[in-house]
A protein has these predicted regions:
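Glycine/threonine-rich flexible loop motifs
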Residues: 131-141
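N-terminal phosphate-binding or glycine-rich loops at protein starts, especially the Walker A/P-loop
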Residues: 24-68
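Conserved small/polar residues in nucleotide/adenosyl-binding loops
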Residues: 173-180
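Bacterial Sec-dependent N-terminal signal peptides
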Residues: 1-24
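A short helix->loop->beta-strand "cap" motif at the edges of active sites that frequently abuts
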Residues: 70, 153-156
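Short internal beta-strands
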Residues: 73-79
Length: 180
């Protein structure tokens, strides 16, 4: 029940913020022309959750990539789980996704960082999670641990950017390339 309330509040926050947006935001997940060539023919792991949708219709990135015949080996689930069904602080368990049959590995339980054994059958990790920019959210630390594990195990990692839903632009650093 608490997860549902949190999801409703989060959704209202996103809707409220989107009314202030000055234009159409194109997320990293929607830029398939940029990243599909980097993952085709590779074994892909994903760090995604219920915010990892593509387009205006709520189609999950996992489903989108499976339709593109991308070899998704496993999904690493952050706090609240892959489908967003776990309450805040609740341990997320390993398992299989009931919709796709893809293996789900928890990064919010006994281990916060993928192990070498969990990464051995993966060539590249895609990270696509909408963060709200609040310090108490664990998604940014999940990204840090996954980056660390990829570096330690010589795995590629692609972060699909999801800009702040309130249309904030950081003026401290700008990059001329979407790959920087």
């Amino acid at each position: 029940m608490q997860a549902r309330s949190s999801l409703i509040l989060f959704s209202l926050f996103i809707i409220l913020c989107s009314t202030y947006a000055s234009g159409k935001v194109i997320t990293g997940a929607e830029r398939m022309d940029q990243y599909l060539p980097l993952i085709k023919g590779k074994r892909v792991g994903m760090v995604v959750n219920h915010t990892s949708i593509v387009g205006t219709e709520p189609i999950h990135l996992l489903d989108t990539l499976l339709k593109q015949k991308i070899d998704i080996v496993k999904v690493f689930a952050p706090e609240h789980g892959f489908r967003g069904n776990a309450d805040a602080g609740e341990t997320v368990k390993d398992g299989k996704d009931s919709r796709t049959g893809v293996t789900i590995v928890s990064l919010y339980g006994d281990n916060k960082k993928p192990t070498a054994a969990q990464l051995k059958d993966i060539d590249v990790i895609l990270f696509d999670i909408q963060d709200v920019g609040a310090r108490f959210y664990t998604y940014i630390s999940t990204m840090y641990y996954v980056m660390e594990a990829c570096a330690e195990n010589k795995k590629e990692m692609i972060i699909l950017d999801r800009p702040n839903p309130c249309d904030y632009v950081c003026l401290l650093y700008t990059s001329p390339s979407p790959r920087d």
